[in-house]
């Protein structure tokens, strides 16, 4: 329903957008009413199993309330401590990792990515599953190729916010790594981010191509600067908003060097 509402909006179908938006919200309310136990999501109505993937799907589509997020983070953390594995195959992995990054659990995602080591060691493409290489488990399969989507979007923080990347959202997840460099080729040109953490300070460089604009979303950013000076007064920075739980920065095309305290 969410995707249908977005498609209707693009097509100028206001009635369709409203209809699908209402259906999406009704479904969300029912999921929260009937498929939640102790703050996490049930696998189904008939049983009270709470596999992490059930909560991951809910997080991916924005079902939980903000008040549920601490309990959901705890749910994933406890599952990882207990098993050091999520028992999720190729198909569900994309949803699992997206939920981990959305909940700022990048360190757990980084550790779980180690299951790709045997594919890399064999110098082959992404297999259908994470089992041993065999005639039935080889070749390039989209089920396990999702790091090519997940890592640029969440570690690099780059995702489209307008048609043809006319607008870009920059929202890196800094938890779990010390540095990252990312570039994404678009019809507008190459969007680049690189960041590193040192002594409690995060340094974030951004490059946006011509005729594009960006919204940078950071954790609450103390001592925010751009190019060594005030971010609010920096050329190309249109607005800086300090909101509950995050800092938003509107920027135009160009190159930026932000720094802030974590």
Question: Locations of the language-model features?
Answer:
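Non-catalytic C-terminal accessory modules of carbohydrate-active enzymes
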Residues: 10, 22, 107-262
